[in-house]
Amino acid sequence: MARSKTYQMLMKISGDSSSLKKACEAASEHLDTLGNAAKAAGKVAATALAGIGTAAAGIAVAATSVYTEHEKAANSLAAATGATGKELENLQSAMETVYQNNFGESIEDAASAVSLVSRNIKGLSNQEIAGATEAAIALRDAFEYDVEESTRAAAAIRKNFGGSAEEAFGLIAAGAQNGLDYSGELIDTINEYSSQFSKLGFSADGMFQLLQSGADGTAWNLDKVGDAVKEFSIRAIDGSNTTVAAFEALGYNAATMMDTFAAGGDGANQAFFDVLNTLMDMEDQVARDALGVSLFGTMWEDLGTEAMEAMANASAGAYDTMDALEQINAIKYNDLDSAMEGVKRQAEAVLVRIGEQLAPYAKEGLEYLVNNVLPVVSSKLEEIVPVVIDAGKALWENRGTILALGSAVVTAVGAFKGLQVASAAV
């Protein structure tokens, strides 16, 4: 701190040896110390405020960026489903839930999966949509099933047998874990043959039990098991001479049997297994195969005796899903990368809320930029560009002179430095 004029005047009056001079010097030193401390404190405060400002700006930029990504995903969801108003809000909520629970490769991926679930599986609540989406993504990650295909399969199960989407996905997951996809046809078999199983009074559990029995009984293709059921469901009620003769040869009243199968339900299911077991109990293998073909078509021959016998002994109990989806989620996503991604997404949730508040101001700023700043800049550019072009042309036209002048300057500078060295040596 510079000493004051008052202090300097006192020095002149008091003289160098006076006590007043000493007192003033002591006071001045204290004032200098206080001033330096104040400056230091000011610098610290300024630095702190600058740091806070930089951090706040960084958070604002990050929040706006993340919010924009989520907004784009929501727009994609709206476009894919045609949802508006409250329905769209519910789908957006499901999308955010799925993403926050660490399912999907990105928020866009979560939006795409939610839209497929919404379109393919009707009548789900917001919570059920989120759960079904997470299940579909888990099946994709574990077994490489497309979300579109697995949701169609789950929808087929619900349509033909009832039950929740969660139960349907649980059956698919358990079936895959139990090897039902050995021929790569589990999803297609469910989609194509669920309605045929339903006609014969099967439940969803019963269908999976029969598929499992056929697969365990050396059926070389899962599709063949489904096709055998389809053929029987058609022939059992077609009233053809072949069907009538087959039922009568097995000891049944053909008309009664056809009425039973036409009615569906538990009676049809019980009759199906009764006919199948009667066939398997026949000692004459040639006659059995002939009647089997009459009722099951060529699928009887394709599947073979061992597979058909296994199907006849299929369990009537519930298909054990073993909490397959929970196991997949517990194992598949239980690693450091998944944990870190989960933390990142939790942080994103906070940034989205901040970005939502900042977005209107950012949009206003962009509108102002477009409407007020850019037109001015554009008009000025029209004035500046010709001048720059003329200057460039002048430089190019006189490039020889400029290069020669530059060379002369370099030579002169070199000579001057040489003279400096020589002078220093002398």
At which residue positions do the language-model features occur?
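Hydrophobic, low-dielectric interface segments
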Residues: 41, 52-60, 183, 216-226, ...
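Short, low-complexity N-terminal tether/leader segments at secretion or assembly junctions of large
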Residues: 1-21, 231, 296, 300, ...
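Cys/His-dense Zn2+-coordinating finger/ribbon modules
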Residues: 278
